[in-house]
Amino acid sequence: MMNEMTVEELALGERKFLHDIANHIVVAHGMSNFVLKTIKESKPIGAKDIERLEKSIEAINKMTALLKERRTLLHQLT
């Protein structure tokens, strides 16, 4: 089991975690909305749209990794 963390350390870690997750949500949301708009307007899907979808998936993958790391940390603390 890891060393006891102070309440302040836990709060700072949680704040950073939430900040990182929020950033990735904004990226995934924004990029996917651009592509959705293109699809709704029946415009052809271009390389830029593919890049946006890739960025969206990358952001989701990063969130998944952050959640797994956080879950591991919390299991170590309990």
Model regions: which residues?
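Histidine phosphotransfer helical core of two-component systems
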Residues: 2-13, 24-78
